[in-house]
Curated annotation (Swiss-Prot):
Belongs to the TorC/TorY family. The lineage of its organism: Bacteria, Pseudomonadati, Pseudomonadota, Gammaproteobacteria, Enterobacterales. This is Cytochrome c-type protein TorY. Part of the anaerobic respiratory chain of trimethylamine-N-oxide reductase TorZ. Required for electron transfer to the TorZ terminal enzyme. Heme 5 binds at residues 313, 316-317.
Amino acid sequence: MRGKKRIGLLFLLIAVVVGGGGLLLAQKVLHKTSDTAFCLSCHSMSKPFEEYQGTVHFSNQKGIRAECADCHIPKSGMDYLFAKLKASKDIYHEFVSGKIDSDDKFEAHRQEMAETVWKELKATDSATCRSCHSFDAMDIASQSESAQKMHNKAQKDSETCIDCHKGIAHFPPEIKMDDNAAHELESQAATSVTNGAHIYPFKTSHIGELATVNPGTDLTVVDASGKQPIVLLQGYQMQGSENTLYLAAGQRLALATLSEEGIKALTVNGEWQADEYGNQWRQASLQGALTDPALADRKPLWQYAEKLDDTYCAGCHAPIAADHYTVNAWPSIAKGMGARTSMSENELDILTRYFQYNAKDITEKQ
């Protein structure tokens, strides 16, 4: 009986030693396969590593470096184990499928890989980001004005880091709008109009030789009998910039640019009046033949703008509501952000106008 007990204790001791040794070995393996050197042992990781070397996460004045695991692997718990298990697919694609074994293949799958990481970070409330950064530790008052606005908004709306901070350690995917969206917009142009109807250009258009009209501008049809409708354009002139008609006094949303003939053809509807900054404004209107097709409603144009926003802007940050900024603030903000995308000049113009027409100081949203 004693012999059996001793054998049982011996087996138990062996099991404890083997189990403990196995756990220590597993921990060692998990730790070793999480360091940057191991990540770089895969050829396909050389490209993202080069991108990462040009960022503040690799080199900065504080001398603090975020390694691969700091961003891509949760620190502990089941999230850590799941991340390690899911990483087995990377080994498969490296050595078996060859899915990203060339620069061309890597670029072809960049968006897919980026969206996978963004989704994982979103699901964990950007846990790996918050292991270094936290709102509690931030001196928000010392940040730039734009950073203060966005961080205060993020706290208020319970947004997470990855909602805005995409493409900060590796190049973001280059996203392009489907051309079908633009063709669909053009197909919705009004085929016939009636007197008194409101129509809206969906691209840069012309009132004869008098004016170049911007997308989204409200035009009233005054004579629909001819091949080209005669339209009425109403707006405001600013002294010193008489060749431009704006939406309202003090609001620099340009409706149209006038030629010399257009300026002469203007009907002035009031005297010059000063705004709060001393700029002089007056109402004016222009009539002429619209030579380009237009929409019967702004809705399709704004739906197209929202697609642009979702395609190009949401890849880097959470959507910013149009009423977050004023009509005069939006152009410089949109231009600065648009420069980081592959948006065309026309696409950026339409998106900017969508933001302006729905800005926080526009009383009646367009």
